Amino acid sequence: MVGVSKTFTNQKKVLNNIYLSFFYGAKIGIIGLNGSGKSTLMKIIAGLEKNFQGEVVFSPGYTVGYLEQEPQLDDTKTVREVVEEGCAEVVALLKEYEEVNAKFMEPMDDDQMAKLIERQGELTEAIDHKNGWELDATLERAMDALRCPDPDEPVKHLSGGERRRVALCRLLLQEPDVLLLDEPTNDIDVNTLRALEEGLNNFAGCAVVISHDRWFLDRIATHILAFEGDSQVVFFEGSYSEYEENKRKRLGDDTPHRVKYRKLLA
């Protein structure tokens, strides 16, 4: 993010000339009062908010996954069908593999047979590379870890907390480079919270998490991005508790605190 600012139509400025980058392995907790600009910043990173000043530059080939506070799910699908969307590429490969195998039962000449065998080999290699043969086990482990409802349960029957868990499960299976979570601990129980912590701690990319749960942030955050009022944003390297200690030491210090700039996904 290069010089990013955002002013709403009522002239309220929530972001003011922010320079910010992320890097693999970082777990960044975003804190601040409601209305301070946290969700706006996240939507800009996700590419959902286009009306802002400045520039957002991404490394080639990056992927971003975003969990909103109220996830949008297809109510016509089952829990498993929604979770499968997180492995869409593998699902498509397996479907084509079955279709190719079925074609071997059809009459064909030698040239057609050779092409079919070649395609079958390509699909087998691609599925092997993605460990796609274990799709059912992968989905089951992911759903169990986040205590998702029964796989056959229609999404339209889920509670708000259940929808959030299903959406989070789908998102983690996508394995994006940058993972954006807006209040992921809302409406989840202690066991699901533990699973979320484990998933984030094992996540290889950069995770950016908005949360009012200070205890949760202290367990997962390697950095804190704090909206401290008057459009002032502080980027701190360390846990939430360490940030709080640093903030207490800064009380009475009039030196301006600027967001540190780091190279993103080089």
Regions found by a protein language model. Give the residues of each.
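ABC ATP-binding cassette signature C-motif
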Residues: M1-A266
